[in-house]
Every structure is written in C-alpha cells, then in structure tokens.
C-alpha cells in the first residue's frame, strides 16, 4: 500500500494484477475496491450491476471505488499502459 493509504484493517482479497487492456472480476460481497500501480498512473474502470465508473490508479495506492452494498460482481479493467493491482475489501 502507499503511505497512509490502503485498507490495512479491513478484510480484503489478495491483490490481482491487471495488465494493460485486460480486466479481472471480484465476486459479490465486497463494498470497496482499492487500486495501485508500481509506478506511474493508469485509467481504470469498474463495471457493476448498479453502474459503470471510470477512475484512476497511481503508485500512492490511495485510489478506490467504494460505498457499495456488496451486491453483484465487480469487473475492474485497466485502460492505462502500466499494470494495476486491485483488491476488494469488505
């Protein structure tokens, strides 16, 4: 996690690596998804049954999509040109 960021006290999945141009899916039951890169930044998107959002990830590890009730699978995609790590948390 980046300095002062990241869900260190929550119950989270293991990070999944998302290569540029690809996506990963997380099962239903998580309320937040955190994102980081090893270096640089990347545009990312989240596709869920209740909406579609575009955001960004950077090496500080502060980026997240949150506030969900946990219902529905979450698909996270990487529109950038550097790998992104994503993990889902309760």
Swiss-Prot record:
Record's keyword terms, sorted: Lectin
GO MF annotation, one: carbohydrate binding
Function: Lectin specific for core(alpha 1-6)fucosylated N-glycans. Inhibits platelet aggregation.
Name listed for the protein in its UniProt record: Hypnin-A3
């Amino acid at each position: 996690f980046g300095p002062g960021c990241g869900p260190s006290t929550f119950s989270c999945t293991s990070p999944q690596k998302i290569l540029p141009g690809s996506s990963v899916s997380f099962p239903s039951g998580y309320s937040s998804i955190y994102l980081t890169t090893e270096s640089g930044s990347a545009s990312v998107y989240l596709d869920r049954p209740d909406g579609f959002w575009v955001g960004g990830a950077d090496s500080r590890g502060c980026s997240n999509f949150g506030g969900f009730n946990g219902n529905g699978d979450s698909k996270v995609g990487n529109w950038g040109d550097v790998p992104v790590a994503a993990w889902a948390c309760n």
